[in-house]
């Protein structure tokens, strides 16, 4: 995929980091595979894999290593409800280009409610109080006053901008199939404007983004795969081609 160049070209072990030893998350094959480094696409990089394969652990570690809040938001978000992120980020080295992002954001589906609540807490509470409304950058409307999917799209349409670095953890969790298409279109606009995405997803729709790099997290570590070979695509196609057969196998006593 051709762009003006990636903000982060690759991710490697930091000096002295030991991968593949110890407990969680080092015991995950996908994490251990980082010992060999991971190249990122200058446009869109996807991580796919079963629940528990480590893709969300990787996304979180990449975002934290880039200076973002572990629970979501930008580098300026200072809230914390539970210190649950792993120590993996401290063991990573981001190989950056000379380009620097104009903006950045870490979108976590599981903690987006907390992110929205933090934004609400930053709003002026008294008439005439100094400081602008932080929600202006998110469409001017409370994210809590919208559906989960609407608030996700409000974030992408309003807060995300050109020359941005964005980490998304399962954004499809809040989106209908139709809005997954909207998400792909918005990503395309932002990549054309110099942005870079790293996305963990189960969505065959998002994975169809043209020219994206897809890594599958599995028992053998991290493997680069084509769209047609990605597990979410294969399983979805198989089910849609023969739903009765799949259901018969699943529901047999």
Outline where the language-model segments fall:
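ATP-binding Walker
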Residues: 52-53
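Loop/turn-to-beta-strand initiation segments
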Residues: 103, 162-165, 191-198
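Conserved P-loop NTPase mechanochemical-coupling segment
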Residues: 116-146
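GG-anchored amphipathic helix commonly corresponding to the ABC/SMC/Rad50 NBD signature/C-loop
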Residues: 138, 142, 146-170, 178-190
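ABC ATPase nucleotide-binding domain signature region
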Residues: 44-46, 56-124
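Phosphate-binding P-loop
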Residues: 31-42, 159-161, 189
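N-terminal pre-Walker A segment at the start of P-loop NTPase domains
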Residues: 2-36
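C-terminal lobe/lid and adjacent interdomain/linker elements of RecA-like ASCE P-loop ATPase modules
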Residues: 178-196, 203-253
